[in-house]
């Protein structure tokens, strides 16, 4: 079994959710909503993780959230709570989202640029990376003025650095090497 972000147990739960999801994209959107809630509201995450909080109280909370999400996901979260796995719910859902991306042949990338990318630039990057990886690309654009121009792309463990700052550093290194070699001659 493939081990994703949350470890073996989270992976098992995520694969179970994936296998019972008749409409994966609908469940995916709902899972993204729950992940957002858990990441942005630390109290809810701590509440679900706390072993001193009764299952009944946790179930009541899930029922409140259940008004906004798919019934399959609500039932799944109830099973997670009943099995005392509320402490890894975020990991389970993130692993599920990774499975959906893999199923849809998607890859998330991070693009660091000195300014916000235009729609045209994003499309160009997506097209180029689709050719390279054969997957649909979703971009997260991070702004870092220190790179001066160009961009840095991070895809899993690959880094493509075509920033002006990187280019200038390379020129500095080449200049130093040229000066050293001319002095030694």
From Swiss-Prot:
<keyword id="KW-0139">CF(1)</keyword>
<comment type="similarity">
    <text>Belongs to the ATPase delta chain family.</text>
</comment>
<keyword id="KW-1003">Cell membrane</keyword>
<keyword id="KW-0472">Membrane</keyword>
<dbReference type="InterPro" id="IPR026015">
    <property type="entry name" value="ATP_synth_OSCP/delta_N_sf"/>
</dbReference>
<dbReference type="Pfam" id="PF00213">
    <property type="entry name" value="OSCP"/>
</dbReference>
<dbReference type="GO" id="GO:0045259">
    <property type="term" value="C:proton-transporting ATP synthase complex"/>
</dbReference>
<keyword id="KW-0406">Ion transport</keyword>
<protein>
    <recommendedName>
        <fullName>ATP synthase subunit delta</fullName>
    </recommendedName>
</protein>
<comment type="subunit">
    <text>F-type ATPases have 2 components, F(1) - the catalytic core - and F(0) - the membrane proton channel. F(1) has five subunits: alpha(3), beta(3), gamma(1), delta(1), epsilon(1). F(0) has three main subunits: a(1), b(2) and c(10-14). The alpha and beta chains form an alternating ring which encloses part of the gamma chain. F(1) is attached to F(0) by a central stalk formed by the gamma and epsilon chains, while a peripheral stalk is formed by the delta and b chains.</text>
</comment>
<comment type="function">
    <text>This protein is part of the stalk that links CF(0) to CF(1). It either transmits conformational changes from CF(0) to CF(1) or is implicated in proton conduction.</text>
</comment>
<comment type="function">
    <text>F(1)F(0) ATP synthase produces ATP from ADP in the presence of a proton or sodium gradient. F-type ATPases consist of two structural domains, F(1) containing the extramembraneous catalytic core and F(0) containing the membrane proton channel, linked together by a central stalk and a peripheral stalk. During catalysis, ATP synthesis in the catalytic domain of F(1) is coupled via a rotary mechanism of the central stalk subunits to proton translocation.</text>
</comment>
<keyword id="KW-0375">Hydrogen ion transport</keyword>
<dbReference type="InterPro" id="IPR000711">
    <property type="entry name" value="ATPase_OSCP/dsu"/>
</dbReference>
<dbReference type="GO" id="GO:0046933">
    <property type="term" value="F:proton-transporting ATP synthase activity, rotational mechanism"/>
</dbReference>
<keyword id="KW-0813">Transport</keyword>
<dbReference type="GO" id="GO:0005886">
    <property type="term" value="C:plasma membrane"/>
</dbReference>
<dbReference type="InterPro" id="IPR020781">
    <property type="entry name" value="ATPase_OSCP/d_CS"/>
</dbReference>
<keyword id="KW-0066">ATP synthesis</keyword>
<keyword id="KW-0997">Cell inner membrane</keyword>
């Amino acid at each position: 079994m493939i081990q994703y972000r949350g470890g073996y147990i989270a992976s098992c739960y995520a694969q179970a959710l994936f296998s019972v999801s008749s409409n994966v994209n609908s469940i995916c959107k709902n899972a993204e909503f729950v992940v957002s809630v858990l990441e942005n509201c630390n109290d809810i995450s701590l509440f679900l993780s706390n072993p001193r909080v009764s299952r009944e109280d946790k179930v009541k909370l899930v029922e409140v959230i259940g008004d906004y999400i798919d019934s399959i996901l609500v039932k799944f979260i109830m099973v997670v709570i009943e099995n005392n796995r509320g402490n890894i719910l975020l990991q389970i859902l993130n692993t599920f989202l990774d499975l959906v991306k893999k199923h849809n042949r998607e890859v998330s990338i991070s693009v660091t640029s000195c300014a916000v990318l235009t729609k045209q630039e994003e499309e160009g990057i997506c097209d180029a990376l689709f050719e390279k990886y054969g997957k649909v690309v979703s971009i997260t654009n991070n702004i870092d003025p220190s790179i001066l121009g160009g961009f840095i792309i991070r895809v899993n463990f690959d880094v493509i650095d075509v920033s002006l700052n990187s280019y200038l550093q390379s020129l500095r290194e080449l200049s130093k090497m040229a000066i050293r070699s001319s002095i030694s001659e």
